Amino acid sequence: MLGPMIEIDKNGSELSPLELWIENILKGQKQFAVLVDPDKCTKEMVPKLMKYLPQQATHIFVGGSTVAPGKTHQLICAIKQHGALPVWIFPGDAEQISSEADALLFLSLISGNNPKYLIGQQTRAAAQLRTMDLHTISTAYLLIDGGAQSAVARVTGTQPLPAEDLEMILNRTMAAYHMGVKAIYLEA
């Protein structure tokens, strides 16, 4: 089993959260994820969040750069209690993993060379994932210079790629593709 958000395709096969997401895109259905930071949204705020969530939202991403242990899990449980949208974890580190989510964006910060965020956090997460029934989506994370230092750059000590260096951005993206990454996340 690949997790709770499994659907069946026309041939009777199970679709993972990633396959369902891609199938919806190929059908021309727009996908819109709302990112909720557990440091800025408490479980008590979730009913109001769900009330004012844009109707176009198809997913909820939960995660942040610096989140205290347990907060992500609490927020995911509250969101699932008050809504029906798939919840995917967008983790800042391995402490933000929860078995209650529908999927985990298994991030590797490939725009920099900090081994802690290239493979270190992923190694820590792998130990937890062995005991969970949580679908993972390998995701390359690229920080692109947007003119101001982001929380991710500050926390990870990673410099963003220059926005005008399209060759470097393309090369990093293609390297991720050749390593089998299923999704690319660009942040500026």
Task: Indicate residue ranges for each PLM-predicted region.
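N-terminal amphipathic alpha-helix/helix-capping segment at the start of soluble metabolic enzymes
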Residues: L2-V36, A126-S138, D145
